[in-house]
């Protein structure tokens, strides 16, 4: 089983903001990344206490886009999801919900699927909903996973990937939207390579990995 433990990072992060002279009302990248790194520090230290390891949760899609805080959620002792794209994660969660035979567990899993993907490093909206939605910022993961597969598995150039995506997603995304997120994909893929150059080990599950 799993033991649930909540450790507040609020006091530690606020103290850190004071130490470096950062106004906590300024919700910029420093505000976000300080929280992500504090989370990781807590996990690493508890792992030391328990003589255990920190299991990373970052997936292949996040690694491709560099959508992780360097030395924050980017780091662990073992990255179990490192070769699993986010679209597959969703399929696996839905399959577990559909077949688990436990109504309470299934309800939780379906709720997870209905919740927008988010690192939740910014304050919530006034109505309590998530303000920071990853796919609003970097684009739909189903597109990025499509781009990644054809780029890494087959070495397709951007022009061919654009053509294939137009065929595969006809009626769902127009050419302008696909081109916008394709440019985002390639820009981030190469720009964020430095994060992939120092990743923890992880298993290779499918035919595409980084």
What name fits each language-model region?
Residues 1-210:
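ATP/NTP-dependent adenylation/nucleotidyl-transfer catalytic domains that generate, transfer
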């Amino acid at each position: 089983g799993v033991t649930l433990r909540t450790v507040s990072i609020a006091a530690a992060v606020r103290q850190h903001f004071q130490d470096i002279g950062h106004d906590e009302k300024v919700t910029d990248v420093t505000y976000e990344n300080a929280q992500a790194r504090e989370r990781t520090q807590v996990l690493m230290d508890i792992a030391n206490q328990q003589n255990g390891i920190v299991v990373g949760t970052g997936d292949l899609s996040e690694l491709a886009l560099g959508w992780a805080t360097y030395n924050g959620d980017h780091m662990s002792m073992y990255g179990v999801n490192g070769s699993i794209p986010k679209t597959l994660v969703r399929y696996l969660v839905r399959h577990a919900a559909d077949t688990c035979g436990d109504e309470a567990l299934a309800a939780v899993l379906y709720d997870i699927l209905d919740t927008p993907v988010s690192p939740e490093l910014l304050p919530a909206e006034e109505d309590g909903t998530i303000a920071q939605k990853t796919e609003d910022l970097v684009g739909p993961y189903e597109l990025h996973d499509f781009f990644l597969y054809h780029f890494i598995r087959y070495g397709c150039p951007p022009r061919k990937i654009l053509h294939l995506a137009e065929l595969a997603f006809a009626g769902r995304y127009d050419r302008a939207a696909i081109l916008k997120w394709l440019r985002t994909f390639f820009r981030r893929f190469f720009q964020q390579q430095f994060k992939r150059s120092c990743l923890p080990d992880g298993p290779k599950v499918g035919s595409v990995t980084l």
